[in-house]
Amino acid sequence: MEELIAIVGPTAVGKTELAVAWARRINGEIVSADSRQIYRWMDIGTAKPSPEEQAQAPHHLIDIRDPDQPFSLAEFCDLATAAIADIRGRGRIPLLVGGTGQYLAAFLEGWQVPRVAPQPDLRAELELIAAREGPAVLHARLAAVDPVAASRIPPTNVRRVVRALEVYLVSGEPISRLQERKEPPFRPRTIWLHRPRAELYARADARIERMIAAGLVEEVAGLLARGYDWSLPAMSSLGYIQFRPYFTGEADLPTCIERLRFDTHAFIRRQEMWFRRLPNLEIWTPDHPSWREITA
Protein backbone atom coordinates (compact mmCIF):
# COMPACT_ATOMS: atom_id res chain seq x y z
CA MET A 1 0.00 0.00 0.00
CA GLU A 2 1.45 3.34 -1.05
CA GLU A 3 1.96 6.23 1.34
CA LEU A 4 0.03 9.47 0.85
CA ILE A 5 1.55 12.59 2.36
CA ALA A 6 -1.01 15.12 3.59
CA ILE A 7 0.11 18.59 4.67
CA VAL A 8 -2.57 20.13 6.88
CA GLY A 9 -2.79 23.18 9.06
CA PRO A 10 -4.85 26.26 9.87
CA THR A 11 -5.06 29.33 7.73
CA ALA A 12 -1.85 31.41 7.61
CA VAL A 13 0.35 28.66 9.07
CA GLY A 14 2.50 28.36 5.93
CA LYS A 15 1.11 25.32 4.08
CA THR A 16 1.58 26.66 0.56
CA GLU A 17 5.20 27.66 1.03
CA LEU A 18 6.14 24.26 2.43
CA ALA A 19 4.06 22.28 -0.07
CA VAL A 20 5.44 24.05 -3.14
CA ALA A 21 9.03 23.70 -1.92
CA TRP A 22 8.53 20.03 -1.09
CA ALA A 23 6.82 19.26 -4.40
CA ARG A 24 9.75 20.79 -6.28
CA ARG A 25 12.20 18.59 -4.36
CA ILE A 26 10.39 15.27 -4.88
CA ASN A 27 8.91 15.64 -8.38
CA GLY A 28 5.53 16.16 -6.77
CA GLU A 29 2.15 17.69 -7.56
CA ILE A 30 -0.29 19.29 -5.15
CA VAL A 31 -3.90 18.18 -4.68
CA SER A 32 -5.78 20.97 -2.93
CA ALA A 33 -8.10 20.10 -0.04
CA ASP A 34 -9.65 23.55 0.24
CA SER A 35 -13.40 23.93 -0.19
CA ARG A 36 -13.14 27.55 -1.36
CA GLN A 37 -10.12 27.52 -3.63
CA ILE A 38 -12.19 25.44 -6.05
CA TYR A 39 -13.96 28.65 -7.12
CA ARG A 40 -12.89 30.87 -9.99
CA TRP A 41 -12.57 34.63 -9.39
CA MET A 42 -12.11 34.09 -5.66
CA ASP A 43 -8.34 34.40 -5.45
CA ILE A 44 -7.44 36.94 -2.79
CA GLY A 45 -9.98 36.06 -0.12
CA THR A 46 -9.26 32.34 -0.33
CA ALA A 47 -5.46 32.87 -0.23
CA LYS A 48 -5.23 30.84 -3.41
CA PRO A 49 -1.66 29.92 -4.44
CA SER A 50 -0.34 32.64 -6.72
CA PRO A 51 0.27 32.02 -10.43
CA GLU A 52 3.99 31.97 -9.63
CA GLU A 53 3.50 29.30 -6.95
CA GLN A 54 1.27 27.24 -9.23
CA ALA A 55 3.93 27.47 -11.94
CA GLN A 56 6.53 26.02 -9.58
CA ALA A 57 4.43 22.92 -8.81
CA PRO A 58 1.31 21.66 -10.61
CA HIS A 59 -1.88 22.12 -8.58
CA HIS A 60 -5.13 20.15 -8.84
CA LEU A 61 -8.69 20.98 -7.68
CA ILE A 62 -8.19 24.74 -7.92
CA ASP A 63 -10.42 26.94 -10.15
CA ILE A 64 -12.71 24.06 -11.11
CA ARG A 65 -16.11 25.64 -10.38
CA ASP A 66 -17.85 28.99 -10.83
CA PRO A 67 -19.13 30.50 -7.56
CA ASP A 68 -22.73 29.56 -8.35
CA GLN A 69 -21.97 25.92 -9.12
CA PRO A 70 -22.52 23.32 -6.38
CA PHE A 71 -19.67 21.17 -5.13
CA SER A 72 -20.08 18.33 -2.67
CA LEU A 73 -17.88 16.36 -0.33
CA ALA A 74 -18.48 13.30 -2.50
CA GLU A 75 -17.25 15.19 -5.56
CA PHE A 76 -14.12 16.23 -3.70
CA CYS A 77 -13.35 12.64 -2.71
CA ASP A 78 -13.92 11.41 -6.27
CA LEU A 79 -11.82 14.14 -7.88
CA ALA A 80 -9.01 13.85 -5.32
CA THR A 81 -8.89 10.08 -5.86
CA ALA A 82 -8.71 10.57 -9.63
CA ALA A 83 -6.04 13.28 -9.36
CA ILE A 84 -3.85 11.16 -7.11
CA ALA A 85 -4.16 8.18 -9.46
CA ASP A 86 -3.29 10.39 -12.44
CA ILE A 87 -0.25 11.87 -10.68
CA ARG A 88 1.05 8.45 -9.68
CA GLY A 89 0.34 7.09 -13.14
CA ARG A 90 2.77 9.64 -14.54
CA GLY A 91 5.48 8.63 -12.10
CA ARG A 92 5.11 11.68 -9.87
CA ILE A 93 4.29 12.05 -6.17
CA PRO A 94 1.00 13.53 -4.91
CA LEU A 95 0.84 15.84 -1.91
CA LEU A 96 -2.61 16.43 -0.41
CA VAL A 97 -2.58 19.97 0.98
CA GLY A 98 -5.27 22.01 2.69
CA GLY A 99 -7.15 23.20 5.71
CA THR A 100 -10.76 22.10 5.13
CA GLY A 101 -11.14 19.68 8.02
CA GLN A 102 -14.15 17.79 6.72
CA TYR A 103 -12.53 17.19 3.33
CA LEU A 104 -9.35 15.94 4.96
CA ALA A 105 -11.11 13.71 7.48
CA ALA A 106 -13.41 12.18 4.88
CA PHE A 107 -10.58 11.40 2.50
CA LEU A 108 -7.92 10.26 4.96
CA GLU A 109 -10.29 8.25 7.16
CA GLY A 110 -12.10 6.53 4.29
CA TRP A 111 -15.60 7.91 4.85
CA GLN A 112 -18.31 6.41 2.70
CA VAL A 113 -19.73 9.75 1.62
CA PRO A 114 -23.44 9.76 0.66
CA ARG A 115 -24.04 10.22 -3.06
CA VAL A 116 -27.28 12.16 -2.56
CA ALA A 117 -27.39 15.08 -4.99
CA PRO A 118 -28.34 18.51 -3.63
CA GLN A 119 -32.10 19.14 -3.57
CA PRO A 120 -32.52 22.92 -3.89
CA ASP A 121 -36.24 23.02 -3.09
CA LEU A 122 -35.90 20.78 -0.05
CA ARG A 123 -32.91 22.77 1.18
CA ALA A 124 -34.82 26.02 0.83
CA GLU A 125 -37.71 24.55 2.82
CA LEU A 126 -35.43 23.38 5.62
CA GLU A 127 -33.51 26.65 5.70
CA LEU A 128 -36.80 28.52 5.97
CA ILE A 129 -37.70 26.46 9.04
CA ALA A 130 -34.37 27.38 10.63
CA ALA A 131 -34.89 31.05 9.79
CA ARG A 132 -38.46 31.21 11.07
CA GLU A 133 -38.41 28.83 14.02
CA GLY A 134 -34.74 28.82 14.93
CA PRO A 135 -31.82 26.44 14.32
CA ALA A 136 -32.65 24.45 17.47
CA VAL A 137 -35.99 23.37 15.99
CA LEU A 138 -34.31 22.05 12.85
CA HIS A 139 -31.62 20.34 14.93
CA ALA A 140 -34.33 18.62 16.99
CA ARG A 141 -35.79 17.19 13.79
CA LEU A 142 -32.39 15.77 12.93
CA ALA A 143 -32.00 14.31 16.42
CA ALA A 144 -35.32 12.50 15.99
CA VAL A 145 -34.20 10.63 12.86
CA ASP A 146 -30.41 10.51 13.24
CA PRO A 147 -29.27 11.07 16.84
CA VAL A 148 -25.69 10.09 15.98
CA ALA A 149 -25.40 12.85 13.37
CA ALA A 150 -27.14 15.30 15.69
CA SER A 151 -24.56 14.59 18.39
CA ARG A 152 -21.77 15.45 15.95
CA ILE A 153 -23.27 18.59 14.39
CA PRO A 154 -23.91 21.67 16.54
CA PRO A 155 -27.32 23.34 16.12
CA THR A 156 -25.60 26.52 14.95
CA ASN A 157 -24.16 24.76 11.88
CA VAL A 158 -27.39 25.05 9.92
CA ARG A 159 -25.80 24.04 6.62
CA ARG A 160 -24.63 20.67 7.93
CA VAL A 161 -27.94 20.08 9.75
CA VAL A 162 -29.79 20.78 6.49
CA ARG A 163 -27.52 18.40 4.58
CA ALA A 164 -28.01 15.61 7.12
CA LEU A 165 -31.79 16.00 6.94
CA GLU A 166 -31.65 16.22 3.16
CA VAL A 167 -29.78 12.91 2.94
CA TYR A 168 -32.24 11.21 5.28
CA LEU A 169 -35.35 12.55 3.56
CA VAL A 170 -34.11 11.62 0.07
CA SER A 171 -32.46 8.27 0.78
CA GLY A 172 -34.32 7.07 3.84
CA GLU A 173 -30.97 6.36 5.48
CA PRO A 174 -29.31 8.33 8.29
CA ILE A 175 -26.25 10.19 7.08
CA SER A 176 -24.29 8.77 10.02
CA ARG A 177 -24.85 5.24 8.68
CA LEU A 178 -23.97 6.23 5.14
CA GLN A 179 -20.76 7.81 6.42
CA GLU A 180 -19.39 4.61 7.93
CA ARG A 181 -15.75 4.18 7.09
CA LYS A 182 -13.57 1.67 5.31
CA GLU A 183 -9.82 1.44 5.09
CA PRO A 184 -8.52 3.92 2.46
CA PRO A 185 -6.35 2.50 -0.36
CA PHE A 186 -3.23 4.25 0.95
CA ARG A 187 -1.24 4.77 4.15
CA PRO A 188 -1.82 8.36 5.24
CA ARG A 189 1.12 10.31 6.60
CA THR A 190 -0.51 13.43 7.98
CA ILE A 191 1.79 16.36 8.74
CA TRP A 192 0.12 19.01 10.88
CA LEU A 193 1.92 22.33 10.60
CA HIS A 194 1.60 23.92 14.00
CA ARG A 195 2.38 27.34 15.44
CA PRO A 196 1.45 28.90 18.80
CA ARG A 197 -2.05 30.37 18.73
CA ALA A 198 -0.87 33.95 19.29
CA GLU A 199 1.59 33.65 16.42
CA LEU A 200 -1.11 32.28 14.13
CA TYR A 201 -3.43 35.16 14.99
CA ALA A 202 -0.67 37.67 14.24
CA ARG A 203 0.15 35.99 10.93
CA ALA A 204 -3.54 35.90 9.99
CA ASP A 205 -3.97 39.59 10.84
CA ALA A 206 -0.94 40.50 8.74
CA ARG A 207 -2.27 38.47 5.85
CA ILE A 208 -5.63 40.22 6.06
CA GLU A 209 -3.83 43.54 5.73
CA ARG A 210 -2.03 42.23 2.64
CA MET A 211 -5.33 40.99 1.20
CA ILE A 212 -6.95 44.39 1.63
CA ALA A 213 -3.96 46.06 -0.02
CA ALA A 214 -4.08 43.52 -2.85
CA GLY A 215 -7.72 44.37 -3.64
CA LEU A 216 -9.92 42.01 -1.61
CA VAL A 217 -12.77 44.52 -1.37
CA GLU A 218 -12.59 45.06 -5.12
CA GLU A 219 -12.64 41.28 -5.63
CA VAL A 220 -15.88 41.04 -3.63
CA ALA A 221 -17.34 43.91 -5.67
CA GLY A 222 -16.37 42.11 -8.86
CA LEU A 223 -18.18 38.96 -7.78
CA LEU A 224 -21.32 40.96 -7.03
CA ALA A 225 -21.01 42.68 -10.40
CA ARG A 226 -20.91 39.26 -12.07
CA GLY A 227 -24.26 38.49 -10.46
CA TYR A 228 -23.11 36.24 -7.63
CA ASP A 229 -25.29 37.12 -4.65
CA TRP A 230 -24.96 36.59 -0.93
CA SER A 231 -27.26 33.55 -0.92
CA LEU A 232 -24.61 31.39 -2.60
CA PRO A 233 -22.48 29.10 -0.39
CA ALA A 234 -19.37 30.48 -2.09
CA MET A 235 -20.28 34.01 -1.03
CA SER A 236 -20.68 32.91 2.58
CA SER A 237 -16.97 32.07 2.66
CA LEU A 238 -14.59 33.55 5.17
CA GLY A 239 -13.11 36.65 3.58
CA TYR A 240 -16.27 37.50 1.63
CA ILE A 241 -19.39 37.38 3.81
CA GLN A 242 -17.77 39.75 6.33
CA PHE A 243 -18.01 42.52 3.73
CA ARG A 244 -21.74 42.14 3.13
CA PRO A 245 -22.63 44.93 5.62
CA TYR A 246 -20.24 47.25 3.78
CA PHE A 247 -21.91 46.65 0.43
CA THR A 248 -25.42 46.91 1.89
CA GLY A 249 -24.57 50.15 3.67
CA GLU A 250 -24.96 48.70 7.17
CA ALA A 251 -21.34 49.11 8.29
CA ASP A 252 -18.17 50.91 7.35
CA LEU A 253 -15.11 49.18 5.95
CA PRO A 254 -12.97 49.21 9.15
CA THR A 255 -15.80 47.48 11.03
CA CYS A 256 -15.98 44.74 8.39
CA ILE A 257 -12.22 44.26 8.41
CA GLU A 258 -12.25 43.92 12.19
CA ARG A 259 -15.03 41.34 11.85
CA LEU A 260 -12.89 39.43 9.39
CA ARG A 261 -10.05 39.35 11.91
CA PHE A 262 -12.36 38.08 14.64
CA ASP A 263 -13.93 35.42 12.43
CA THR A 264 -10.54 34.29 11.13
CA HIS A 265 -9.30 33.70 14.67
CA ALA A 266 -12.44 31.64 15.40
CA PHE A 267 -11.94 29.72 12.15
CA ILE A 268 -8.38 28.83 13.17
CA ARG A 269 -9.69 27.35 16.41
CA ARG A 270 -12.28 25.26 14.56
CA GLN A 271 -9.71 24.02 12.07
CA GLU A 272 -7.44 22.81 14.84
CA MET A 273 -10.29 20.79 16.34
CA TRP A 274 -10.56 18.88 13.05
CA PHE A 275 -6.83 18.28 12.71
CA ARG A 276 -6.54 16.58 16.11
CA ARG A 277 -8.68 13.70 14.88
CA LEU A 278 -6.79 12.96 11.66
CA PRO A 279 -4.92 9.65 11.34
CA ASN A 280 -1.15 9.15 11.68
CA LEU A 281 -0.42 12.71 12.77
CA GLU A 282 3.06 14.17 12.80
CA ILE A 283 3.20 17.63 14.36
CA TRP A 284 5.75 19.93 12.76
CA THR A 285 6.61 23.31 14.25
CA PRO A 286 8.70 25.88 12.35
CA ASP A 287 11.85 24.64 14.10
CA HIS A 288 11.24 21.05 12.97
CA PRO A 289 14.37 19.99 11.03
CA SER A 290 12.38 18.83 7.99
CA TRP A 291 10.31 22.02 7.77
CA ARG A 292 13.46 24.13 8.01
CA GLU A 293 15.34 22.02 5.47
CA ILE A 294 12.54 21.93 2.89
CA THR A 295 11.93 25.69 2.97
CA ALA A 296 15.59 26.71 3.25
Curated annotation (Swiss-Prot):
Its cofactor is Mg(2+). Coiled coil: none annotated. Substrate binds at residues 11-16. GO terms for molecular function: ATP binding; tRNA dimethylallyltransferase activity. The record marks 100, 123 as: Interaction with substrate tRNA. It is an enzyme of class 2 (transferase). It catalyses: adenosine(37) in tRNA + dimethylallyl diphosphate = N(6)-dimethylallyladenosine(37) in tRNA + diphosphate. SUPFAM superfamilies: P-loop containing nucleoside triphosphate hydrolases. The keyword Secreted does not apply. Keywords: ATP-binding, Magnesium, Nucleotide-binding, Transferase, tRNA processing. Residues 34-37 are annotated as: Interaction with substrate tRNA. The keyword Metal-binding does not apply. ATP binds at residues 9-16. GO terms for biological process: tRNA modification. It comes from the Bacteria. Its EC number is 2.5.1.75. HAMAP family: IPP_trans. PANTHER family: TRNA DIMETHYLALLYLTRANSFERASE. Monomer. Catalyzes the transfer of a dimethylallyl group onto the adenine at position 37 in tRNAs that read codons beginning with uridine, leading to the formation of N6-(dimethylallyl)adenosine (i(6)A). Belongs to the IPP transferase family. This is tRNA dimethylallyltransferase.
